């Protein structure tokens, strides 16, 4: 589906994240790749636009979770892959816990991230500029990509329509997540291109709702620790629960 001129959404299937194609006058960029099983589907999506994976100039991963990075090894055979340095480190070390492999019952083939991104980097496609925002919270190496000309944010799992947040998993934490959404709240953003769910043109409202949910999550975690203290359960019980986080 073409969302804006030169921007297409490839809707994720079977729990895979959405992928987005950005086509400028000089470069064609794929944002996220879904699960390892998404290879054939994404190849078909490209074919529908008269393209093959070899026509891509760059793949950008918004973070290391396997539902976003799973098909990257196939695309890495013909074009460079970019990610935030923290995400790239987890991919290089095959950190299966933070990459959520077990949660998706999938394994990620070895591949290298070629380009390390930092906050403030710009990816120029020719007529389209993507500004890299480091947005930790959902995980430590998460990024969003801002296309300022049309006020479009490729928000991945950081913030989605109706204020849905992607959860605090693996390397994520609530405090960073709140700081990230506070930062996004002061930017000029109209449209969210999320990793899951529908596209939204109410970015300000979505971010505000997401912030409320995160503050609620912080309050809930404080209440949980208070309950553990009251019932005599300690840190070891909490750690046993955390070890199961990647096995649901």
What are these regions (language model features)?
Residues 1-8, 101-105, 126-128:
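Short Pro/Gly-enriched beta-strand edge/turn motifs at strand-loop
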Residues 49-54, 123-128, 148, 186-187:
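Glycine-rich phosphate-binding loop signature in dinucleotide/nucleotide-binding domains
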Residues 224-248:
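C-terminal regulatory/interaction regions
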Residues 29-31, 60, 81, 152-154, ...:
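Residue-level marker for buried hydrophobic side chains located in beta-strands
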Residues 1-49, 144-156:
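Conserved beta-strand hairpin/beta-sheet module of binuclear metal-dependent hydrolase folds
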Residues 36-37, 129-223:
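Metallo-beta-lactamase
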């Amino acid at each position: 589906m073409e969302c804006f001129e030169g921007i297409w959404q490839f809707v994720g299937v079977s729990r895979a994240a959405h992928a987005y194609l950005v086509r400028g006058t000089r470069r064609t960029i794929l944002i996220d790749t879904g699960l390892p099983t998404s290879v054939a589907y994404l190849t078909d999506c490209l074919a529908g636009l008269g393209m093959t994976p070899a026509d891509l100039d760059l793949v950008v991963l918004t973070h290391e979770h396997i539902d976003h990075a799973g098909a990257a090894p196939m695309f890495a055979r013909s074009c460079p892959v970019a990610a935030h340095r923290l995400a790239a480190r987890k991919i290089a070390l095959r950190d299966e816990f933070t990459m959520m492999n077990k949660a998706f019952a999938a394994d990620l083939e070895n591949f290298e991230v070629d380009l390390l991104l930092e906050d403030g980097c710009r990816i120029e496609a020719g007529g389209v500029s993507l500004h890299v925002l480091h947005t930790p919270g959902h995980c430590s190496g998460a990024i969003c990509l801002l296309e300022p000309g049309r006020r479009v944010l490729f928000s991945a799992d950081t913030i989605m329509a109706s204020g849905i947040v992607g959860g605090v998993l693996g390397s994520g934490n609530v405090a960073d997540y709140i700081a990230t959404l506070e930062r996004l709240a002061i930017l000029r953003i109209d449209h969210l291109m999320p990793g899951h769910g529908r596209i939204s043109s109410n970015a300000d409202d979505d971010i505000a709702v997401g912030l409320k949910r995160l503050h609620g999550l912080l309050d809930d975690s404080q209440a949980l620790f208070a309950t553990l203290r009251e019932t005599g359960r300690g840190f070891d019980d909490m750690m046993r629960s955390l070890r199961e986080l990647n096995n649901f």
